[in-house]
A protein has these predicted regions:
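Active-site acidic catalytic loop and adjacent metal/ATP-binding pocket
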Residues: 29-53, 201-248
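Conserved kinase catalytic-core helix
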Residues: 114-155, 201
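AlphaC helix (C-helix) of the protein kinase catalytic domain N-lobe
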Residues: 76, 80-83, 140-143, 253
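Active-site activation/catalytic loop segments of kinase-like enzymes and analogous catalytic loops
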Residues: 248-287, 302-323
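Conserved NTP-binding catalytic cores of kinases and kinase-like/nucleotidyltransferase enzymes
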Residues: 1-102, 195, 229-233, 352-393
Length: 393
């Protein structure tokens, strides 16, 4: 931690041209790839705030991730630069104060000791949890609305960091899932995916290309990385920030939160309310998305891709065949993994039934039934805040 603070002091001093001192370092955690530290600015010749957050990527770029994926640091740096350039009222992220690509260091605004969305879901106030979910969904929609025309800016920022061809990890994983899941279902669950169901899933890959509905996405949306500040929800952690079709982001909220991997469910109707909050923001940019005949099939396609990606990751472990492939966008439940996976397929069935698309309905029914011997029929508990609710509070 001392090394991280020393690097941050040196960076800020170099940027300001006068000595900056940092003190009282507090470890905020991080991941296997990075360390996150809160520091007090004890010697401040200019107008830096009283405290800052420093994120330091550990190891060399080719050691930062145990997979064959690209280095995540340039993606987070470009994401923070993109949002810092926006007007303050459009910025749903911390401000970036300094960035050192060589030492893989970011110095960010300290948003304070706020509750996270995860804290509200794990609390005991259903009304507060509902407000937090709807506020976060609305903030996510606004984040996408204000970045709708900025993919070129994001690409330019990545190129300045040496990234010539940027990738969306969900798109990579989805293409692999579309190729592999039919065989996985057949070999591990003895479920034969009908040709119509496979064709429907593969048609959803149209969302992975250059659609007209692309905007910034944090890559995986986790309640642990959503701070609830006095100015509204703020998002953290853009290690794989990217541009993708907005339906894919909305679907990840409705599942809910496959990147978090919590074995819990939302009250009946909450997913739809969250989608409506998100849509109220993006429809200002794309008015046609307020039309269910336009948005409905797109949400179904996005849900299909997410469920297939989650199946590729989780199914081998569910049936005792070892862990599936590691994926940036899918969290592994620590318990009730079969029930979590079954809940994703039920969500897909619900969406397909509403769109009167039969092929995914039949496949979802077969998968849910095949997961029962592994615990797929075990009821998932509600998030603690909703433990006394059967529907929206």
């Amino acid at each position: 931690m001392d090394r991280t603070v020393a690097f941050a002091e040196e960076l800020l001093t170099r940027r300001s041209g006068a000595q900056v001192r940092l003190a009282d370092a507090e470890d905020l955690g991080g991941s296997t790839r990075s360390r996150v530290v809160r520091v007090r600015v004890s010697e401040n010749p200019f107008s830096l705030p009283r405290s800052l957050v420093v994120k330091h990527y550990l190891g060399a770029p080719d050691q930062a991730d145990g997979t064959d994926r690209a280095d995540p640091f340039p993606y987070e740096a470009a994401s923070c630069q993109l949002f810092t350039a926006l007007p303050a009222e459009d910025r749903a992220t911390p401000t970036l104060y300094a960035n050192d690509p060589e030492r893989r260091l970011l110095v960010l605004e300290d948003l304070g000791r706020c509750s996270t969305l995860a804290d509200k879901l794990d609390g005991d106030d259903p009304k507060a949890a509902e407000r937090a979910l709807l506020g976060a969904s609305r903030a996510l929609g606004n984040l996408q609305a204000v970045t709708a025309a900025r993919e070129g800016d994001f690409g330019a920022l990545l190129r300045r960091s040496g990234v010539r061809h940027w990738r969306d990890p969900l798109a990579d994983d989805a293409r692999s899932a579309l190729a592999e899941v039919p065989d996985l279902l057949a070999h591990l669950l003895r479920v034969e995916a009908a040709p119509a169901a496979v064709a429907h899933a593969r048609s959803a890959s149209s969302l992975l290309g250059g659609t007209e509905y692309r905007a910034f996405s944090p890559s995986e949306v986790s309640p642990e990385n959503c701070l609830l500040t006095g100015a509204g929800a703020r998002f953290l952690d853009f290690e794989w920030g990217c541009f993708r079709d907005v339906a894919l982001t909305a679907a990840s909220v409705r599942l809910p939160f496959p990147g978090w991997g919590r074995a819990a469910v939302l009250p009946t109707g909450m997913a739809e309310a969250m989608a409506a909050s998100w849509q109220s923001e993006v429809s200002g940019v794309w008015p046609e998305l307020a039309d269910p005949t336009v948005s409905g099939p797109r949400h179904l396609a996005a849900t299909t891709l997410w469920v297939w990606v989650c199946t590729r990751t989780l199914l081998p472990g569910v049936v005792g065949r070892g862990a599936g492939p590691d994926q940036v966008v899918v969290g592994r439940p620590t318990e009730r993994a079969a029930a979590v996976l079954a809940s994703y397929w039920r969500r897909l069935r619900t969406d397909a039934d509403r769109q009167h698309v039969d092929a995914p309905v039949g496949l979802a029914d077969a998968v849910v039934a095949a997961l029962e011997p592994y615990g797929g029929d075990e009821p998932l508990p509600p998030f603690p805040a909703f433990s006394r609710c059967t529907s929206r509070p």
